[in-house]
């Protein structure tokens, strides 16, 4: 049976700060808000954050990537992000030296690496 969608859960430091960042800065709509858990609609699946409390470690080594339709869209998103209160903007969009994508990276308030990318043919 084929799943109808997918959701990936990440622990977060502060659910309200995370919710504000992903809605106000990145513009992702909330799909479900369950108090200590919030799901964001990414258009092709869901990204969720959970406040497990202070004893739960955050995930490490992950990159949350959002695919855009074109390299021009990546450039436009970079211009938007550059003007906003983002954390750890890691440079302008470029072709990745190892993978066939055009992208840029930055961090969310939890320290997770975020990427906007366009896969290249």
What are the roles of these predicted feature ranges?
Residues 29-62, 113-118:
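Conserved short beta-strand elements that form part of the metal-binding/catalytic scaffold
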Residues 23-25, 77-82:
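Short amphipathic alpha-helices in soluble, non-transmembrane regions
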Residues 16-29:
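Amphipathic alpha-helical segments
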């Amino acid at each position: 049976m084929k799943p109808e969608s997918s959701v990936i859960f990440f622990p977060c430091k502060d659910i309200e700060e995370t919710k504000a960042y992903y809605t106000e800065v990145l513009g992702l709509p909330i799909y479900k808000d369950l108090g200590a858990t919030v799901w964001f609609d990414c258009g092709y699946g869901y990204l969720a954050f959970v406040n497990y409390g202070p004893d739960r470690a955050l995930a490490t080594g992950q990159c949350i990537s959002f695919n855009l339709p074109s390299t021009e869209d990546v450039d436009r998103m970079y211009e938007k992000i550059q003007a906003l209160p983002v954390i750890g903007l890691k440079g302008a969009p470029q072709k990745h030296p190892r993978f066939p994508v055009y992208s840029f990276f930055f961090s969310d308030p939890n320290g997770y690496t975020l990427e906007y990318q366009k896969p290249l043919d």
